[in-house]
Each structure stands twice: as C-alpha cells, then as structure tokens.
Amino acid sequence: MTEAAPDRMTLVLGGARSGKSAYAERLIEACPAPWLYIATAQAWDEEMRVRIHEHRARRSGSWQTLDVPTALPEAVAAATGPVLVDCLTLWLTNLLLAEADLEAATDALARACAAAAGPLVLVANEVGLGIVPDNALARRFRDAAGRLHQRLARDADRVVLTVAGLPLTVKPSRENP
C-alpha cells in the first residue's frame, strides 16, 4: 500500500504489534530518499535483538539508521531530511531508567520537532488504554507517556492510531485529509 507523503509532523500511535512502525515507514518512503530512521530501542535481551533485526531487515538500503537511546531532541534537531523516530515509548523508558527529568525532555523534544528541517513521523505505543498499573513506577511511566503524547499530538499536523494494521486518523491533516 502506498501512502501520501507525510505532513511536517505526524504522530503514529498504537498498541504492540499494531502495524504502527510499518505504516510510519510507508509514510516516510513517500518522501524523496534518503530517509533517516532514529531508533531508540536497546537490545537488553534476545527478544529485543530479534525485534530490532526484523525492523532493520524490513527496510531498504535507502534508510540510514541512527541508534539514539536518550539524545533524541538533539538527533531530531540535527536531521536534514525525512525522519522516522521509532519509538517514543522506548525513549521515555530509557530516560526513566536514567532518572532523567521527563518534563524537561518532553519540552526539548517538542521544541526540536517544531523546528525539524524535513517531514517527521513519530511512533509511540499507546499505553494508557489498559488497567491502572499496580505500582508507582509503572503509573509514573504511563502518565509521562500520556503527557508526551498529548503534547506532541497538539503540535502535530496529523495523528494516526493503528489498530490491527489499519491506520485510523485521529487528527486529520489540512494538507492530506
């Protein structure tokens, strides 16, 4: 399936294995290459190594991959062409584990996204649809993710929720309705 070129900033949300990354890749691939894939995942275990390998194997040679566990605002600010960030959820996890200031990091990322030089597609897991977590750390993470998503959705030109591989437009674009 071919997608229309993305707007200046598109936020793609969805659950685990919902098809959000593949959809985001199709959006960026509608732009002239080369494309930059900013990956935030860290291979903590074998399952993550396999997931990272699968994601990389799916992409063509026109993609450049930049592994950025925590310095995401700086990487977005330095990019000069079409960028896919996958994913904000793991970036937030990395920051939480590093005991970083999540509010300051959210602000820095929002500023970098607003000033991005080219089309930007951001991917994140929607984690706020389930039950209330039973521990403080998980609740803090869920709340921080919700605040991050709200901030970026407000600034985004378009917001899409992927469910079962289907993109559902939550915030339509004026340019690509």
Model-derived features with residue positions:
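Conserved P-loop
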Residues: T2, T10-A78
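Helix-adjacent hinge/juxtasegments
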Residues: A57-A105
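Structural motif
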Residues: L11, L84, V121-V123
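Short, low-complexity, intrinsically disordered N-terminal peptides in bacterial proteins
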Residues: M1-T10, A78, A115, P172-P177
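Short, well-ordered beta-strand core segments
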Residues: W35, V83, R158-L161
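Short, hinge-like loop/turn segments at secondary-structure boundaries
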Residues: E54-R56, P82, A138-R140
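Residue-level signal for inorganic ion chemistry
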Residues: A24, H55, L84, N125, ...
